Regions:
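Active-site-proximal alpha-helix that buttresses catalytic centers in soluble enzyme cores
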Residues: 2-119
Length: 119
């Protein structure tokens, strides 16, 4: 491969590997579910309708009615011993196992969630 004369020198250093998943609420509590739903459903890439109409629907109806139903569903799958959702648990474990397998000083492996914590 031919090197460009005006291309800056690239210093190679550490490499980061980030395993990202959609996200999950912090708990099965009504407020945590509401906070998560608000963050997720406020993303214009998730809901592509008229933003003014959507804000009314979201804030008047969904964020007042949906957290109770969603909390009930999360309680059925919630990992009580770890106090986290399976999605967060398995995403975090994948990052830890991958880090043990191929991680080193130059290769840092971690995880994040798009919505919720850690994001």
């Amino acid at each position: 491969m031919k090197k460009e004369l005006n291309h800056p020198l690239i210093n190679f250093g550490k490499t980061g590997v980030l395993i990202i998943n959609l996200g999950t609420p912090d708990s099965t509590g009504w407020l945590d579910i509401r906070k998560y739903l608000k963050e997720f459903l406020s993303d214009r890439r998730v809901i592509e309708v008229n933003p003014i109409l959507w804000k009314i629907i979201l804030n008047v109806f969904i964020l007042n009615l949906r957290p109770s139903k969603t909390a009930k569903a999360y309680k059925e799958i919630w990992m009580k011993d770890k106090n986290m959702s399976p999605l967060k648990h398995y995403t975090e474990n994948q990052a830890k196992k991958l880090s043990k397998l191929i991680g080193n000083e130059e290769r840092i492996i971690d995880f994040a969630l798009r919505y919720g914590n850690p994001s």
